Amino acid sequence: MSLRPSERVEVRRNRYKVAVDAEEGRRRREDNMVEIRKSRREESLLKKRREGLQAQAPVPASAATGVDKKLESLPAMIGGVYSDDNNLQLEATTQFRKLLSIERSPPIEEVIQSGVVPRFVQFLTREDFPQLQFEAAWALTNIASGTSENTKVVIDHGAVPIFVKLLGSSSDDVREQAVWALGNVAGDSPKCRDLVLANGALLPLLAQLNEHTKLSMLRNATWTLSNFCRGKPQPSFEQTRPALPALARLIHSNDEEVLTDACWALSYLSDGTNDKIQAVIEAGVCPRLVELLLHPSPSVLIPALRTVGNIVTGDDAQTQCIIDHQALPCLLSLLTQNLKKSIKKEACWTISNITAGNKDQIQAVINAGIIGPLVNLLQTAEFDIKKEAAWAISNATSGGSHDQIKYLVSEGCIKPLCDLLICPDIRIVTVCLEGLENILKVGETDKTLAAGDVNVFSQMIDEAEGLEKIENLQSHDNNEIYEKAVKILEAYWMDEEDDTMGATTVAAPQGATFDFGQGGGAAQFK
């Protein structure tokens, strides 16, 4: 449904803020998912292959030759796996595990083709022989770390429910390897993730996360938990909600890996409707998330910021929770420090959702000293950051009071908003036009109150070369932008421009013309 320009400001605020089945809310989250994909190194890996203890050593040039030699002994290894002798079974399974653990290009396909996967799955059930269970689980973990087809082989042989059962094993090593395997399966795709969850993996996984858990298990279990929460379409929130209390504890860890994966899990769980956001808030995570906005490692800071940003897409009360925990000074530091582009972009996005709130929330942003640095980014930053800063300023003009909007102008927002009117992004042009229109309304009110004949802000826009740009937008291909430009010119410049423009007819799309002559300036459609 297309909206008249006059309707867009309020609809944009409501949709962008509440984000319930909202076009704008979805746009933000989709953009951010692209950002996640682009910065995969900042996020945990979808799958992890467990390498051997010697993996830290340099790989000799002859490594490939060694693999070929081992593949030559495959028939003997297969024989050992299928023998009835426990020692031969363990020795052969360990050889396969080592083969699958080499650092570069492990021969996963060749191992699958050798037909040993169903036997490894059988070995998972050998409670009498935990060492064999462990080696088989490790081998299957590494097979599942491969392609989706490789993972499917592990699933199709019935390994998932057995791995879930192994989360209750008396062997620490077996439990940890089962956690890792389930993380690899869940990380393959939303379909595989849902299969793992449907097999009841979440609660026994959460049981691994207690004060006695060793660090390697803590890291693996938190990573697997993040894979359980990740992906689009999202898992059922009722299935993943039980993870919230554990995540609320994990974000107090001192370990960077645990912190990173716990914050990513929270970012996935908070990405959605207000009921999800409320559940995340009620888990008590907000104070710690705000603290983590100042974490020295970007790998922790980015998912913490993403989660805070998701929370402020909620309603005003949910946004206030973040403000009350002193997030604004942290966001200010993210804008002003020499941090990477993606962090500044996310910080501006977060602020734009706060300025889409009520007047008190806009005032909190002003009081935090954020507007000046925001305007500076709007003027000087890369385009991706400018776009988010434009939303933040425009939202503030939409919901701000008369005095708040005058403050935005005093901080220099007019010139950079005018400069963006020639950018190629249609949505940003519209956002800037809306911001300028809201500023002009305040100037008009001031003009009336002072019984004067000059709208000071229209003069400032003219001096910033904004008037010329708005006039040029009358020939824009996008009808919505054309209509908005005409509306602004008609409301704020027509009287002043009558003499200079005379009866000039400005070309307009779709057969419309706009005449600034004596006829009063109605658009005529022919």
From Swiss-Prot:
GO terms for biological process: NLS-bearing protein import into nucleus. Keywords: Cytoplasm, Host-virus interaction, Protein transport, Repeat, Transport. InterPro entries: ARM-like (IPR011989), ARM-type_fold (IPR016024), Arm_3 (IPR032413), Armadillo (IPR000225), Importin-a_IBB (IPR002652), Importin-a_IBB_sf (IPR036975), Importin_alpha (IPR024931). GO terms for cellular component: nucleus; perinuclear region of cytoplasm. SMART domains: ARM. It holds the Pfam family Arm_3. Induction: In both etiolated and green leaves, down-regulated by light. In green leaf, increased by dark treatment. It is found in: Cytoplasm, Perinuclear region. ARM repeats lie at residues 105-145, 148-187, 190-230, 232-271, 274-313, 316-356, 359-398, 402-441. Highly expressed in callus, followed by root and etiolated leaf. Low expression in green leaf. It comes from the Eukaryota. Functions in nuclear protein import. Binds specifically and directly to substrates containing either a simple or bipartite NLS motif. Promotes docking of import substrates to the nuclear envelope. Forms a complex with importin subunit beta-1. The whole complex, most stable and composed of importin alpha, importin beta and NLS substrate, is referred to as PTAC or pore targeting complex. Interacts with mungbean yellow mosaic virus capsid protein. Belongs to the importin alpha family. This is Importin subunit alpha-1a. It comes from Oryza sativa subsp. japonica. The lineage of its organism: Eukaryota, Viridiplantae, Streptophyta, Embryophyta, Tracheophyta.
